[in-house]
Every structure is written in C-alpha cells, then in structure tokens.
C-alpha cells in the first residue's frame, strides 16, 4: 500500500478525532487511575485503527521536519501531570512549533518496566505514517498520529477486509483492564426531514420556531456511534459526541458502564467525564413479586377489553393471517416539557435527548427481539411554556390521557398512511406512530402526588390515534431504558414478571429494569419476543410497515470515585435543586439511600437511590456498592487452614453452620485468602414449636427488649424489604414505618417469605429445593422439585366489578392449588379478603390487616398493601378451598387479576371435587338512625349474618353465624350542628349493691353549646323536655351464692295430707351457686278446706204409670271422712233433686167411675195441708193436681188450683 493511500486514511481518522471532540488547545487532560477503584474519570480515551499495524513503526521512524516532530518509539518526554495522563491531541500552532524544536514527540526507545507500561497506556495509537496531514478549515493545527509501540495489550489482529473510514477503535481503561470499542457512525434513528422546534420561539415573537439549517439546534448525524466491545460477543456500545464530550453506555456481560461529562458544557477542550458502573447482583433473588415494577412503571390497559397480559404461556396461539415483515419502523415525535428544557437548557436538552434516543434505537436492534424494529425520530419539540390544553402534573394517568389528546390534535391530522401529510412540520412528513413526552415532573400513576414511578404507557397503544403515547421521567442516562421499556408496553409487550416462565430473568421488560438498578443484559426475553410477534401479526401494527424513506447514510460505526468529587449536599442539589442538602438525621443509613432535605420542607425526601460511590459515611470510610467500607484496601495473602464447623445458627428449623480461615502473617488487617474466607452449609433442626414468632419478628422483638424504652418492648414487627432481603427492617406494630435496625439479619434467616434461600453473613445464599446450599435444584410452577412444569395447568382470569358495596365473592380457589397470585390492576379504595373452611381469614369481618404472612388453608399466604394497591400470593398447596372476596366501599371501576395452578391429572373418584358449601360471615348491612337531632350524635351499622354462595349474597338468620366472632358496629358521627340548649348527662354510677337490688345515680345539667364548641351551663327551664332521671333502680349481679326460690304451689289434695312444689334457680351470673345451700323444691302439706261434699241417693220410681211424671232422690251435705251431716257444702255445687220422667201414654177412654170431680174431692177429702210442700208447687205447675194421688199429698196447693179454675169458668 502506497504512502498516498495511507495518508488518506490518516486524514479521515484525524477528522474523526476532531469531531469526537478529543482536541484541546494545549490543555492537559486524560485518564487518572487508582488501582483499588473501579470508577474512572475519562477526559478522552485513545483512538486506535482496526487495520494492521506497521511493523516498522513498532520500534521507531524517521524524522518529519514538516510536522515538527521526530519519529521514535519513546514517550512524550517531560509531560507534566500523572504518568497515566493523556495530553490533548491538537495544540496551538505556536506550541506545536516550539514543541517541534525543543521537545520531540517521540524520543529514545522506552525502557522496560513499570514506567514503560504506564506511559504506553496513555498514548493515542491510531495507525499512520509520516507525511503532512491537513485538517479542514478551522482546525487548530495539523497533526500526525504517532505509531503504536508493541505491547501485550495491543488491539486484536487486523481484519482481512478493508476498513471503512467511518470506523474508529476507542480504548477505555475500566474494570481493571482495557476495553477496545469498535464504533461506527450511526444516525439511522433520525428521519430524513428531522426537525427541532421550540414552542413558543424565544424572543419578542413568541411563535413556533423551526431550527434553520446550520442552527445549533439541528444535530449532526455523524456524531452518533454504535458498536461493540472487541473480544466480547453480545456486548453493545452506544455513544454521542455531539457536544464535544462523550455520552453513552457500554453493556458488557453483566456490567453496565455509563459515560457522561461531569458538567453540561461539553466544550471542545478536554475536561473530566464521569464513568460509573451498575452491575446486576448475582446474589439477589428475583421473585415473582410484580409490586416492584408496578411501583416504578405504569401500564394502562384498554378500558373496553381485557388486558393482553393475561395470556397463558403454554396455550396454543391463534394463527394470524398477517405474516411478519423483515423490518418495522416507528415514526416518533418526542416532546420535552418546560421543566426539562429549563433544567438542562435548550441546547443541552436537545443533545441529551438525542443521545438517549440513539441508545433506545440500539436497544431495539438487539437480535433477541427476533425482528428488526427501527426508531425513526421525526421531530423534537422543546416546550418553553406548557400549552393551555396540556396537563403536566403529578397524576400520571391524567397526564398521559391529556398528552395523548394534545398530540392527536397537533400531529394526528392525516388522510392515509400511504400519503404525505401537510402540517406545520413540513410538506412530506410521514404519519406519527408514537409520541413520547419527557418530563422532569415527579408523577404517580393513579394519584395526584409524587412517587417513584418513572414511566407510563398504554398497553397495545402504538398506531392508535389516541393511545400511542408514552411518558418518561428524566432520570439521567437510565432514561433510555425507561423509554425502551415503555415503548415495549406500547407495542403489546407485558412485564416478564407477568409470565411465569420468564419471571426469573433480568431483561429489558423485567420489573427490575425500570428502576435502573440491578441491570441484567440488554436482551429481550422469549416472552417479550412472543408478545411483540403477537402484536405485529395483528392489524393494530399496520402503521409500522410504512415509513418515511431514510436518506441519511446508514453506516455502522477513573482516577476518582464520583462521590469524592460531589459531596452528599451537592448530590442532593443535583436531585432536588439548589435548596436541597443532605438530611443529617439519616447519616447512619447514608449508604443505603440518599435522603435530602429541601429548605422550607419539614420532612426529608429520597429517590431510593444510594449515593455515589466514594461519598463519606464514617471517619475513614466511604460508601461503595451501598455499604460503608474502609478506605484503605486490604492486601492479598495466602490461604490458611479452615476452622471446624460452627454450631447451627438456630436451635429449631433450618439454620446455617459456617467455618472460616485466616491467612497467616498478616495480622488483624487480613481480609480475604485466595478463594472464599468463609463457607456455609445448611443444618437441620426439629421444627419450631407452634405459637413462636417468626425468626425475623423474633430478632425485631429482641432489639426492642434491648432498647432503653421499656414501653416499646415487644412492640416491633419485621418488615421485609425486597431490595435488601438480608437486612433487618422493623416497624412498630400497627404502623407502616420500617426502620433499618441492622445491615445483616442473623445467619439462617430466610431471604424472603417464600423460597428456600437463606441469609448468611448478610448475603442471600442460594439453596435448592433438595435442601442443599448452593444447589441449583428448583421447583417448577407445579411444585415439583426439578420438574418439567407439565404436571399442572395454570388457571388465570380477571374480575371486574363496577357497582355495589360490602363483600363480593370473586371465586373459590380449590384445594391443591399452588402459585396463587391475586393482584389489583390499579390502586382502589377497596380491600382484598380471603377465608378458608376453618374460618381463618384476612380482612374479613370488616377488620383490615397490615401487610404480613398469614396461615390459611394449610399454606402461608402473603398479603401486601402499599398505599391503595394490594397483592395476595401463596406458594401452596392449599388443603381446603379458599374464598377470595373483595370488600367494596363505593361505586367504582374495580379490576383485579388472579392466577394459580392446579394438578393436570383428575382427582380419584373418592376425591372428586365437590361444589364448596356456602360461606357465612358477619357483614354491616346498613346504618341505623342518629341518636341525636343536633349537637353531635352517633349512628351505628347494623351487623347481620350474610350467606355467600356462588357469588350470590343474601341475609340469613343470625344463628348461622353464631360460631363466628361478631364484629362491633361501626360508629359514625351525625347531626353535628349545634343545639341551642340540651340536657347533658354523665354516665351512671355503679350499683349501690354488688348483689341484689340497689340504686345508681348520675349528674344531669342543662347546657348550651357556643359557636366555638364550648359547653356552658344554662337554666334548667331553658332545656326542652323533662329533666332526665338522676336516680334509677339497679341490681347487682356480682353474687357468689344467690338461690332464688319461687312461690309454693297449692297442696296436691284438698282434704287430707299431700305434697306442694316450688321452682328454685341460681341467680349468680357465673352460675356458681353452692349446691349445699339450695332450698327445697317440694314438701308435705295438709288441707281440709273441702271435706264436706253433697251426697245423693238413688232416683225414685216415676210418680205415674203413664204420661209425664217426676222422679226424686235424697241429697245430703256430709263430711268425707266422718260421715256427719253439715251445712258447709257450697249451694252452687248442689246436684238436682228432681227430674221429669216419661212413660207410655195414658188411655184416653174415660171411666166415670174413676173420675172424682175436684169439687167432690175438695168436699170429701179433709185437707190437713201439703205433705210435700217443696214439690207441690212443681205438681201444680205440671197440671198434676187432677191426679188424686198428688192431690192428696198437695191438697192445699191443689185446692187453690181448682178454686182458680172454677172462678175462670164462672
């Protein structure tokens, strides 16, 4: 290859150096390293060429007078600064000339040794040769690159193909080694007619301003770079150099390196950069808890149809007729709110946002996504004022809805996706597929207050007119991952945590990613790929197949910890503004989270992020990786002998045993041997007795006993923190105020409420389902150790309820269920409730529990409530059915998602599942009347027994709930308007007698309530109604032995000896009367009050032989026992002495011989008076006087009878 060709490549490389901004006017700048740190301050790294090195340049070269340099293989000579410092590439002409005469660039060959190694590390080493190199107009000076000396850490061998002039090789010392980044220019994320607008235009004419050609607001597409780290397959790098500095990230295995300038000037001269690392913790257990990602990421589903995330992983998908295309393009509009523009400045905000979008573009280029998805930025809008019809506030859902409506009005007018659209952007801007709002506003999804949410988007909203919207909060370079994550949601990709088969990984759509902590890799999970393909096969993705043609070239292209440069106060000012300072009250936990106090506010605030590594925590210590560690590094040493295994950390249940080793000869400062210093193993003990508190709770209670406040003893309970599973957080009972009491729980403590992993020395040690520490054996979602997940099936569904109040049954989870998870789709003023067959429950009987673990249906159920959001989970298996209910308080749109697994094999016939029986529970059926009409009264709820069966609720007899604890009625104040006057009474005093009847009293006064609520005494005549009683009767019930006897009954006989009875009962409330003192219930008696009775004789014969006659009998009053006559019988009880009798009719033939005329009878019969005076009156009335026999016995009465007859005839 001739000198001319080499010179051409050198010129291209030199131009690139200038564009990257690695030039300075004689300013000393470079890398500064400290061996014990993994954080770097980068002024500019060295640039390499990828092609083969000139063998002749490895040992020296010829002098080039034109360049003012002499060829050589040595160092810089008397360069000032650190031996690892990198000088500016370009110098002023005067300095260049001086240096060319007095200071040769390369002197004598380097001497071997450490000095040689350090000097080589700081050289710029692109390949080149001697010759003149002219920079474009405006460059400070011409420059020729030096030849790279031979060294072990030289770049890899040359590639066979001819390299492109747009390629650069960037060397960055990090992670205790040199990283070589092969970068190519890549501005494909900018659309052909990309424009930057400021709304309104700054200045006297406040209209929309589009940047003119050549304006500083328009980006140069050549300052965006994409590439990889050589010798590291799967790595990714994305950078921007638009402002003269270097900004972007490197992903290398499990490490993330972020690079950005220390300030926002991004000047052309060299200046410090911040390079910091975020690494995924290999010891952190990734759980299925979706509360974490829901806390930081808001996903709004369709209001009219179920969310697409509720899709079983193993089901057979519907085969769509749409075939996947090879490439999809997302035409995007990006809007920066006024707070964002004001915070960064218009120019810096533009550079920062475009750098972020370049990173987002590269995240979607990852091969794990399965299809090529290109981000095309059509327009960047910088808002200096908030439009009148756009809401920007704390309420995230409201802001998302407002932004979608606003962007539709501004950018949504189009005729057809194939046609060009005519708007204020230009004449041929393509249709908008997505709109992104970047804000500095701290928002929350469902409430109007700040919280930790950093992104929100509509699920499956892309291409939709009013749902293709994303809002992301500015959180530094992590903003790129937030936007990529939320754009994934907008394209129908659910959280990995929502898929059981993908919940254990850390990919872009996992819950951990959105927080910007514990980053995994930049790949997309298998579930994300399937969700995206499902969306792309649907009609909803049709807009992604049409794009504006891309006309831009599509060419691929520390010495100090940051906490040493920024104090805790300065870090708080970066997060919360210039009035913020570090909260001194939280000094003891500074490394776990940076707490700041803003002037004028009473409480400290935090964003849950730890301070920068290097921040002072204690004397002689600094924060590093979230822990307060010593500044002086410990020396390495040789391995020593292991100690015997220690005793088990627990006396019951599972614990850990450990052994240690020390390295001889290094004293107390020895830290680690070659290999682990401490080893652990699981030790098993008998199960802990029932009723003992959990191990974490016991540690919290033990702490409270050690405090100097006895009143707080036994008042602490453990609170589990998912971010620090092996730290001891405790909270007062009944309050949600967790306090970090210890950075390490005791060895043997479980890492969480579920799982087998155990904490040892403050770290979560993995344990397999086979009970072995370090084992990789895991249960599948069916609960089978090392199973294949095919022995069960997943049951999932949604519950939506819009009206009603009280308890509503959602479903009955059958016995044998595992992996139970119930999650509210959004926070609501309602409560989840569970009840099993043994009446154990959570949130039943109108009693709301705090977050914690509960034993129901033979398993441990974990109830989590954060604000208004709730979640219930259980590992299972359940032994009895579980009733899932919702306690609704008011009409609202309420929704929740549930899922669990059940065995695939059907149950045996004798174990066939039966329809669960009805569920009875006490409920508050309504409110009673107020007990006062004014002045403040109370109304109570009416507690009734409720039957729940097949989601139907009905009121039943209270006897059905007799075995349940009846809740106290709820009390609500009512009629609180003041009264003019009213009677006020004190409580009744205790009864004057503790046993038996007594009296009790109270004070009664007439009072008047003033406007300020004060009560004063008034005249009794001013109060309405009679004065309430001041004394009342009472009966003491505290009697040790009180028998109460009833009245004796009458004697069982009325004449003679008999028995009488009475009732006897114990009146003691506790029924503890002494039997020996029990009165008699029966006794003998005598009664002679009814000894005289009427005695009757036999009836006589009938008085006649024919016709009507009479019969009589003797009646006498006689004594029952003695037989004596008396007159003590009751006349009302005397029986009848006579009765009529009837014989055959008399012969009507008259015998004159037998007829005696009454007159003759009266004349011939000497009447001596009536013989039967009692009966004669009856004989006369019965017309029997004509019978001589009766006449003779009653002659006197019959004579008068005949006399009257004769008178009547005469």
Swiss-Prot record:
Residues 130-139 have a biased composition (Polar residues). Disruption phenotype: Homozygous knockout mice are viable, fertile and born in Mendelian ratios. Echocardiographic analysis reveals progressive aortic valve disease, without dysfunction in any of other valves. Valve defects range from aortic regurgitation to severe aortic valve stenosis, or a combination of both. Dysfunctional aortic valves show thickening of the commissures with reduced opening of the valve, occasionally in a 'fish mouth' pattern with only 2 visible commissures, reminiscent of fused bicuspid aortic valves in humans. Residues 794-917 are annotated as: Spacer. Glycans are attached at residues 54, 263, 800, 910, 931, 952, 1012. GO terms for biological process: aortic valve morphogenesis; collagen fibril organization; proteolysis. Residues 69-78 have a biased composition (Gly residues). Residues 31-319 form a propeptide. The active site is at residue 486. Residues 84-98 have a biased composition (Basic and acidic residues). Keywords: Cleavage on pair of basic residues, Disulfide bond, Extracellular matrix, Glycoprotein, Hydrolase, Metal-binding, Metalloprotease, Protease, Repeat, Secreted, Signal, Zinc, Zymogen. SUPFAM superfamilies: Metalloproteases ('zincins'), catalytic domain (SSF55486), TSP-1 type 1 repeat (SSF82895). Residues 143-158 have a biased composition (Pro residues). Transmembrane segments: none annotated. Zn(2+) binds at residues 297, 485, 489, 495. Its cofactor is Zn(2+). Binds 1 zinc ion per subunit. Expressed predominantly in fetal ovary, low levels of expression is also detected in kidney, heart, skeletal muscle, lung and testis. It comes from the Eukaryota. Residues 328-548 form the Peptidase M12B domain. One of its GO terms (cellular component) is extracellular region. InterPro entries: ADAM_Cys-rich, ADAMTS/ADAMTS-like, ADAMTS17/19_C, ADAMTS_ADAMTS-like, ADAMTS_CR_2, ADAMTS_spacer1, MetalloPept_cat_dom_sf, Peptidase_M12B. Residues 113-122 have a biased composition (Acidic residues). This is A disintegrin and metalloproteinase with thrombospondin motifs 19. It comes from Mus musculus. The gene is Adamts19.
